[in-house]
Swiss-Prot record:
This is Nucleotide-binding protein AnaeK_0154. It comes from Anaeromyxobacter sp. (strain K). GO terms for molecular function: ATP binding; ATP hydrolysis activity; GTP binding. GTP binds at D68, A69, R70, E71. Displays ATPase and GTPase activities. It holds the Pfam family RapZ-like_N. Keywords: ATP-binding, GTP-binding, Nucleotide-binding. Belongs to the RapZ-like family. ATP binds at G17, V18, S19, G20, S21, G22, K23, S24.
Length: 294
């Protein structure tokens, strides 16, 4: 008998990706946010789980599950399974977590664990290569891919929480991330803007110790004629882009604004842009990634 999923079905997040990329961390973040979470659920049981959730009087409205490369049927049948669940009313999103080979090798070295696909006598790089090959098709159908190479545990948890929890109901979720080029460009960003053309408060002794959230630093940065012109033009550009992204079915946009260290200029400008967007009715999630780094 085929299970029936109502059109008011639960929100389902399928977490997948390479081993060591942070799937367990992402799952914990969603569990903390109130999702019903299952680790390594065989995909054949997902439809049954959704059917049972329909008899819980709304108690299970959001669920997340981890599926990895050892779930052979998911790798083969993922597109069909996800398509059928969506046709039956389930709100299914696939999040694929990735990281560079170097980062994965380092993480396995730190935990002293064997790679699950390394095989007898195989090395961690062997396992990584085998897993990438096995997951290639699944990566291709993911709604979003997040590269966790430069993210620590806390940054990944914040990112996942903002992605699936904050600002619910918005047709297009916008996240503004201030960052420092010194610490790397956010790999999950859709748009990257470089504001190092502006005078740097770092070289003003009385401003150097204070972040861009400090009114004195913000006044110094935003008081520049070029900063004002930049904000005007960027606001106009986003006013053009956001509805068109939305019309094309994009549900999430990350805009990264960077300066040298991520403490002064990018912070002030990201906050000012967030204020402008929110003033126009666009919900915004603001994250100052590197403001506390030295």
């Amino acid at each position: 008998m085929t299970a029936t999923v109502s059109h008011a079905g639960p929100q389902v997040v399928i977490l997948t990706g390479v081993s060591g990329s942070g799937k367990s961390t992402a799952l914990r973040a969603l569990e903390d946010a109130g999702f019903y979470c299952v680790d390594n659920l065989p995909i054949v049981f997902l439809e049954k789980l959704l059917e049972l959730s329909g008899h819980t009087a709304g108690e299970v409205s959001r669920m997340a599950l981890v599926v990895d490369a050892r779930e052979g049927r998911f790798l083969v049948e993922a597109p069909r399974i996800i398509r059928e669940l969506r046709q039956k009313g389930a709100d299914v999103e696939v999040l694929f977590l990735d990281a560079s080979d170097e980062a994965l090798v380092r993480r396995y070295s730190e935990t002293r664990r064997r790679h699950p696909l390394a095989g007898e006598g195989g090395t961690v790089p062997d396992g990584i290569a085998a897993e990438r090959l096995a997951l290639a098709d699944v990566r291709g159908i993911a709604d979003e891919v997040i590269d966790t190479t430069t993210l620590n545990v806390h940054e990944l948890k914040r990112l996942v929480t903002r992605r699936f929890v904050a600002g619910e109901g918005a047709k297009l979720g916008v996240t503004l991330v201030s960052f420092g080029f010194r610490f790397g460009i956010p790999t999950h960003a859709d748009l990257v803007l470089d504001v190092r053309f502006l005078p740097n408060p770092f070289f003003v002794p009385e401003l150097k110790p204070h972040p861009g959230t400090d009114p004195r630093v913000a006044e110094f940065v935003l008081g520049q004629a070029d900063a004002k012109a930049f904000l005007e033009r960027l606001t106009d550009l986003l006013g053009f882009l956001l509805p068109r992204y939305r019309n094309e079915g994009k549900s999430y946009l990350t805009i990264a604004i960077g300066c040298t260290g991520g403490k002064h200029r990018s912070v002030a400008l990201a906050a000012a842009l967030a204020e402008r967007l929110e003033g126009s009715g666009q919900p915004v999630r603001l994250w100052h990634r590197d403001v506390e780094k030295e």
